[in-house]
């Protein structure tokens, strides 16, 4: 079973100010490389105006992979995490609910 995570992040302003396009691309690539190095598969990256943050949905092989990714991205000093939430597969969860109800 994989581990699906929703995260909201904000750029650390000082890390992104006055960058050339090449420097910006290098920092962005570093983030995606960390995700990939831990088996992460980016499903979506959007901007959430109501949270004033980037919202990402990433699938990982397990929770440890997700946690290690967050730690390494924080170490870059380019993003801060506002919120991290585990997402449950609705079909899988519904099956668990039905199974629990059948045991009654």
Residue ranges of model-derived segments:
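An amphipathic, aromatic/His-enriched active-site/gating alpha helix that lines ligand/cofactor pockets
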Residues: 59-91
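Short cationic amphipathic helices and targeting signals
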Residues: 53-59
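Short S/T/G/P-rich N-terminal loop/turn motif that feeds into the first structured element of a domain
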Residues: 1-36, 41-52, 65, 90-104
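A structural signal for short, well-ordered beta-strand segments
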Residues: 5-7, 56, 84
């Amino acid at each position: 079973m994989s581990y699906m995570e929703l995260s909201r992040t904000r750029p650390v302003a000082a890390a992104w100010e006055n960058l050339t396009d090449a420097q910006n691309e290098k920092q962005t690539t570093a983030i995606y490389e960390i995700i990939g190095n831990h088996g992460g598969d980016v499903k979506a990256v959007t901007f959430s105006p109501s949270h004033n943050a980037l919202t990402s949905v990433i699938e990982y092989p397990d929770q440890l992979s997700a946690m290690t990714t967050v730690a390494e991205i924080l170490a870059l000093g380019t993003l801060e995490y506002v919120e991290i939430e585990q997402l449950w597969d609705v079909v899988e969860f519904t099956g668990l609910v039905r199974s629990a109800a059948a045991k009654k």
